């Protein structure tokens, strides 16, 4: 087998980033080289997203962009993997024959072993990996995938159809990976899965996220543990107790998708408006410093003006610290595709604009309360004498930043906040 210099592109979610940190390790173990510039590469590996229309289009555009390189460099290899391939295994090879290898959702080691082989298309059922090693960026945080697949039945979502059922990794293997990361200088461990609250149920017969948090918390070192993607229907009292450990940041990422009982029912969600409100009240009662993040879909089939107004009232009542908003994507193989009373794109976009305007007001006011306070910041980047970081209140890539004059990254520092806008903070080092 010829060894290749490969340029790697990761599209989509943090779970893909976690997978490809391991994939790059296995590529190197096999003798391939991962390069930072496509001009130096013999080929490209593209990890795709197949979740919604915009993500699919981005993936296809990226594939076509790199396939066009073959016009000038006929020997340039193009390998495509990930959720888009798993979702459309027959259509893609027919539509884009320039691609040298199509690989579905397979473990990182298997994927690395498949590169530069003669097989045109490979797909396996979803499988989790055992940790052997990983190659990460110089950033001080790392994503660790604790499970894959999903057993939920949200009507707008197609992920279970191409990712398979929920499969957890073993406690010991996750702990081994986290120890490796901490020993190699990481300051923040971000736990990800389709639904982190479901971790362990398939392996151990019960939710094991609290036990996992305890084990990671017991690892020596000064670092944060952040939990992402918690399904609101399964945030139990035991799960909430797991956040009491010292290194677990009090950051609760709980995508509710909507708050109207009518829309929640159509979405296949089980918690009611009242139960959601009680959940967030409980979290803030247990952890006064809690930061609440959620995701919202507007324009879902059947969403009336009253449903949307109820949603806005709910957002104003809860005052989420962080919120991501999206227009409903009408996926052809999702159950919601067959629902009546579709909302026009124009109306949905207008509702999204309104939602984000309301959230901007809330975010600004909540950030203003931080002015004059001293907070811990993890510094990640330095630009022209300004160091840029995040507090525990902000997750990587999706939330805001803290800007401070100074030097030195990949470290914690205490910062007194001097200015605050809607999403970002400015401050000065106090130690």
UniProtKB/Swiss-Prot annotation:
Domain MTTase N-terminal: 4-120
One GO CC annotation: cytosol
Gene Ontology molecular function: any one: protein methylthiotransferase activity
One Pfam family recorded for the sequence: TRAM_2
Positions bound to [4Fe-4S] cluster 2: 150, 154, 157
Enzyme class at the top of the EC tree: transferase
Binding positions for [4Fe-4S] cluster 1 per the UniProt entry: 13, 49, 83
UniProt subcellular location: Cytoplasm
Start and end residues of each Radical SAM core domain: 136-365
Gene3D superfamilies, per database record: Methylthiotransferase, N-terminal domain, Nucleic acid-binding proteins, tm_1862 like domain
Keywords: 4Fe-4S, Cytoplasm, Iron, Iron-sulfur, Metal-binding, S-adenosyl-L-methionine, Transferase
Cofactor binding description: Binds 2 [4Fe-4S] clusters. One cluster is coordinated with 3 cysteines and an exchangeable S-adenosyl-L-methionine.
Family affiliation: Belongs to the methylthiotransferase family. RimO subfamily.
Function: Catalyzes the methylthiolation of an aspartic acid residue of ribosomal protein uS12.
Stated name of the protein: Ribosomal protein uS12 methylthiotransferase RimO
Source organism phylogeny: Bacteria, Thermotogati, Thermotogota, Thermotogae, Thermotogales
């Amino acid at each position: 087998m010829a060894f290749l210099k490969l340029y790697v592109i990761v599209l989509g979610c943090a779970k893909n980033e976690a997978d490809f940190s391991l994939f790059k390790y296995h590529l190197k173990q096999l003798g391939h080289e991962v390069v930072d510039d496509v001009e130096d590469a013999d080929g490209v590996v593209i990890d795709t997203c197949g979740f919604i229309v915009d993500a699919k289009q981005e993936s296809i555009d990226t594939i076509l962009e790199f396939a066009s390189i073959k016009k000038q460099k006929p020997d340039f290899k193009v390998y495509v993997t990930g959720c888009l391939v798993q979702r459309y295994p027959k259509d893609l090879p027919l539509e884009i024959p320039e691609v040298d290898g199509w690989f579905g959702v397979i473990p990182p080691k298997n994927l690395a072993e498949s590169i530069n082989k003669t097989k045109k298309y490979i797909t396996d059922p979803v499988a989790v990996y055992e940790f052997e090693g990983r190659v990460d960026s110089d950033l001080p945080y790392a994503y660790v995938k604790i499970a894959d697949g999903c057993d939920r039945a949200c009507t707008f979502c197609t992920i279970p159809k191409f990712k398979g059922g929920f499969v957890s990794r073993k406690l010991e293997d996750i702990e081994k990976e986290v120890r490796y990361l901490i020993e190699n200088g990481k300051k923040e461990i971000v736990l990800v899965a389709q639904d982190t609250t479901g971790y362990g149920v398939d392996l151990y017969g019960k939710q094991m996220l609290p036990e996992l948090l305890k084990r990671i918390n017991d690892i020596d070192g000064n670092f944060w543990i952040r939990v992402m993607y918690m399904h609101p229907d399964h945030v139990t009292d035991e799960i909430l107790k797991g956040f009491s450990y010292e290194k677990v940041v009090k950051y609760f990422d709980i995508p509710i998708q909507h708050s109207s009982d009518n829309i929640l029912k159509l979405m296949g969600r089980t918690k009611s408006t009242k139960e959601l409100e009680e959940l967030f009240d409980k979290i803030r009662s247990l952890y006064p410093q809690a930061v609440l993040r959620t995701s919202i879909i507007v324009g879902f089939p059947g969403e009336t003006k009253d449903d949307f107004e109820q949603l806005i009232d709910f957002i104003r009542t809860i005052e989420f610290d962080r919120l991501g908003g999206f227009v409903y994507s009408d996926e052809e193989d999702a159950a919601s595709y067959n629902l009546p009373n579709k909302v026009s794109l124009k109306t949905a976009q207008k509702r999204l604009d309104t939602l984000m305007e309301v959230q901007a007001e809330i975010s600004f006011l909540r950030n203003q309360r931080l002015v004059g306070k001293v907070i811990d910041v993890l510094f990640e980047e330095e630009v022209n004498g300004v160091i840029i970081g995040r507090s525990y209140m902000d997750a990587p890539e999706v939330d805001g930043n803290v800007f401070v004059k100074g030097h030195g990254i990949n470290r914690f520092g205490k910062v007194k906040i001097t200015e605050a806008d809607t999403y970002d903070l400015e401050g000065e080092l106090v130690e």
